[in-house]
């Protein structure tokens, strides 16, 4: 399968857009959430490369079905992209009720960090 997002080793741009979408095509309402984290893990490794809310920005808390706008973005920093490889990535949302939900909730997004050509 091809990656959902490709970035070159050491690059911190472009920022990573994300949507929190349910399997049925509807979007989560992120109004009033208490935390949104970006998590990224190298395939085959149990340790997480990234697990942070720092750098996560909510731009559009409410999206309509069919929207191509992102709910938000993750801004890469530091050593986020220093190790080439195929990664799994997901968003962890904590709602005001304290309940937690992972997106995508039907698999993981694929991020590839490549070597510069």
Q: Where on the chain are the PLM-derived regions?
A:
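Contiguous segments within soluble domain cores/interaction surfaces
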Residues: 1-117
